[in-house]
């Protein structure tokens, strides 16, 4: 999980979602998981 000021999808399988007001990227590749914070 990477915490970044700006989250972007890295590959085609990355999905940008909102969870409890936070923007997150979820993906099949665990290295691509990101959280805004």
From Swiss-Prot:
UniProt keywords, alphabetically: Ribonucleoprotein, Ribosomal protein
GO CC term, one of those recorded: ribosome
Gene Ontology biological process terms from the UniProt entry: translation
Claim: Secreted is one of the keywords in the record: no
InterPro entries in the record: Ribosomal_bL36, Ribosomal_bL36_sp
SUPFAM superfamilies in the cross-refs: Ribosomal protein L36
Gene Ontology MF term list: structural constituent of ribosome
Similarity field: Belongs to the bacterial ribosomal protein bL36 family.
Subunit field text: Part of the 50S ribosomal subunit.
The protein's name: Large ribosomal subunit protein bL36
Organism: Bacillus subtilis (strain 168)
Taxonomic lineage from the root: Bacteria, Bacillati, Bacillota, Bacilli, Bacillales
């Amino acid at each position: 999980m990477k915490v970044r000021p700006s989250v972007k999808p890295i590959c085609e399988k990355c999905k940008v979602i909102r969870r409890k007001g936070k923007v997150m990227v979820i993906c099949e590749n665990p290295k691509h998981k990101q959280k805004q914070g």
